[in-house]
Amino acid sequence: MYNVKKDFPIFKNQGDPYVYLDSAATTHKPQCVIDSIVDYYSSSYATVNRALYTASHDITFAHWQVRSKVGSWIGAQYDQEIIFTRGTTSSLNLLAIAANDSWLAGGTVVISEAEHHANLVSWELACQRSGATIKKVRVDDEGMVDCSHLEQLLKQGVQLVSLAHVSNVSGAVLPLPEIAHLVHRYEALFAVDGAQGVGKGPLNLSEWGVDFYAFSGHKLYAPTGIGVLYGKKELLESLPPVEGGGDMVIVYDFEELSYQEPPLRFEAGTPHIAGVLGLGAAIDYLQALPFSITDRLTELTHFLYEQLLTVPGIQIIGPKQGAARGSLCSISIPGVQASDLGFLLDGRGISVRSGHQCSQPAMVRWDLGHVLRASLGIYNEQQDILLFVEALKDILRAYRS
């Protein structure tokens, strides 16, 4: 079996054991991504889109090539559908502000009752400014959107539906093609928070009918501070810019102001060039791996779920075994604080997430205070899961004695 960990220097440089089970928060970086950033700053540094000298020309070409790589990974039709942002949160806010300045005013946005704050608060702020209304669609006990309830809301008149591809709490994976078809039947638009979906394998957004898709590079083994907003070309062309600055205008002379076509219309100022190049290197790395990322993560997630079933007295949030689940499991243990468990596990070299996962409405939906979440990346192995579960059992035995 291919040894993925050898490609990630963090696993050589941390102590032993180092069991990292927090890839839903952020993924580690392979050496090739780190090298791409160092090479840019040390050997090929220049700005993009602004100069004719050779170094700038070369890096501008490399920078644009990453749009093609991203488009290939997510299934876009055109390079122009790829807007570089700071991350998922930045992408969703960009979309919400642009929509607020165009077709959202006085309308209705639908989100689920279990969204991440990035998807909740961005639309809440936009609706406060525009006078639009937010309505929430129910999710079932496993975290799946209630499509019957969604259709009821759509019948009342909705401009946009914004949902997470994969829940960062329950791990529920939404059937994007089916939901897109339903949303479009009622002439609404469909936006997706793809933070937890983009790293599970290549996507096919144009075929699925998704109108907008937001994600972060740092959850795709790329650097922090770089993200993407995908939007259908004709929809992006209909939206106004949300920031002004260099490279997003064609003409400005105090009397005339004209904007670039997307994506440059939405990329004012000097971009995060190193981050973009790192994102491209991450996609190159993932596409060259000698195995299916989707299959590997699915198998590991099933193994994690099965092992957690052997822990007495815990509740596993989200889909049952065999159903579609992102590469994470959140658990709740009555009478035991998740933060205590996270602290004690850290003392044994095991990194997991404890808290409300930046999704307080999800905690309300499942009547939880906090959860402990273990999430997987391509570098994880069954041994990581066994060490985590055995440590969890040992801590709980001591906790209950």
UniProtKB/Swiss-Prot annotation:
| Entry-linked PANTHER family | CYSTEINE DESULFURASE, CYSTEINE DESULFURASE 1, CHLOROPLASTIC
Query: Where is the PTM N6-(pyridoxal phosphate)lysine found along the chain?
Result: 219
* Pfam families cross-referenced by the UniProt entry: Aminotran_5 (PF00266)
Keyword Oxidoreductase tagged:
no
Which UniProt keywords are listed? Answer: Pyridoxal phosphate, Transferase
Q: Is Transferase found in the keyword set? A: yes
- Recorded protein name is Probable cysteine desulfurase
The UniProt gene name for this protein comes to csd
EC annotation from Swiss-Prot or TrEMBL: 2.8.1.7
- Give the molecular function GO annotations: cysteine desulfurase activity; pyridoxal phosphate binding
**Gene Ontology BP term (one):** cysteine metabolic process
Q: Which PROSITE patterns match?
A: AA_TRANSFER_CLASS_5
Q: Which cofactor does it need?
A: pyridoxal 5'-phosphate
Q: NCBIfam families this protein is in?
A: sufS
* Active-site positions on this chain: 358 (cysteine persulfide intermediate)
